[in-house]
Design a protein with these regions (language model features):
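A cross-family signal for N-terminal binding/gating loops and helix N-caps
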Residues: 1-147
């Protein structure tokens, strides 16, 4: 498997707690809206952009992806998300109770994924994969640690 550093977009440290959010697929639209209420810097406005549209909006409609792009651009223009000065590898740590796990975020080669050298995230659903792929294509960025 081949990995490489990449020049990511990161929140400015003072706003990082406001940008951070739960994974898009652990909350429904109403829960995402409640979590993002009063938090204009929350990445939920990108990952679950339907929360800023009328309630009857299809979460897979063009309007949602357009809104996600507009919100993502706004976070960059407003200085909430800034580009790293050079390529980086990102180490992270997650804790739940006594369990701690660490990971690495890096660029990789699609060919390695296609050759099954990269383990696929467990229990993925085709509709969710298609949604995240469309969001990544729309943003020209991946806003989640697992894709």
């Amino acid at each position: 498997m081949r990995i490489h550093p990449f020049q990511g977009l990161v929140p400015v440290p003072a706003l990082a707690p406001e940008v951070a959010c739960v994974p898009y697929d652990v909350v429904n639209t109403a829960e995402a809206a409640a979590l993002a209420a009063g938090r204009p810097h929350s990445l939920l406005h990108v990952d679950r952009a339907e929360i800023g549209l009328p309630p009857a909006t299809d979460p897979y409609s063009d309007a949602v992806y357009s809104r996600a792009r507009a919100n993502f651009d706004s976070l960059q223009r407003g200085g909430t998300l800034v580009r790293e000065t050079g390529p980086c590898l990102y180490v992270y740590q997650q804790r739940m109770g006594d369990h701690v796990q660490r990971g690495l975020v890096a660029g990789c080669h699609v060919e390695d994924y296609d050759a099954e050298l990269i383990k696929k995230h467990e229990k993925t659903r085709k509709d969710k994969e298609d949604d995240r792929t469309r969001l990544i294509d729309t943003l020209s960025a991946d806003t989640g640690p697992v894709s």
